[in-house]
């Protein structure tokens, strides 16, 4: 089982192989997540977000993602579409260009590749 630090190292190594720099942020506080999203404007090329339970009800995170208008990938380690009915609804999805669910930790690497391709194609 991977720790959060292990996951960050894994993602950083895989992104490095692609020549991509990544930074990380984790919080259980909705406002802190929103602040981090807002701080990405003009500084980051894209956002990969696993919003956890906020996925299902945080219209504030949706609004923040829409406001910064960066290429965004929604990632879930488990397949949220195969879980309880309430987990199948993502209120943040309209602000995301891609949703990757059920691929475990590899989903983060898939998201990096997807966003890199979109950024390359659309500038």
Regions picked out by a protein language model, each given a short descriptive name:
Residues 40-47:
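Short acidic/histidine-rich motifs immediately flanking catalytic phosphotransfer sites
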Residues 39, 58-67:
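Short Gly/Thr/Asp-enriched flexible loops that form oxyanion-binding sites at enzyme active sites
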Residues 1-18:
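Glycine-rich phosphate/diphosphate-binding loop of Rossmann-like nucleotide-binding domains
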Residues 18, 44, 68-71:
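Helix C-cap/helix->beta junction micro-motif
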Residues 21-24, 73, 82-123:
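Short, glycine-/small-residue-rich phosphate/pyrophosphate-handling segment
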Residues 25-38:
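Structural motif
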């Amino acid at each position: 089982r991977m720790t959060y630090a292990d996951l960050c190292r894994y993602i950083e190594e895989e992104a490095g192989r692609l020549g991509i720099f990544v930074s990380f942020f984790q919080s259980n506080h909705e406002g802190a997540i929103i602040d981090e999203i807002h701080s990405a404007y003009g500084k980051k090329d894209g956002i990969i977000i696993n919003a956890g339970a906020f996925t299902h009800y945080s219209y504030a995170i949706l609004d923040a993602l829409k406001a910064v208008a960066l290429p965004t990938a929604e990632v879930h380690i488990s397949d949220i579409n195969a879980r309880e009915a309430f987990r199948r609804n993502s209120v943040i999805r309209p602000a995301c260009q891609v949703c990757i669910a059920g691929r475990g930790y590899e989903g983060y690497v898939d998201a990096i590749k997807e966003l890199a391709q979109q950024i390359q194609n659309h500038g």
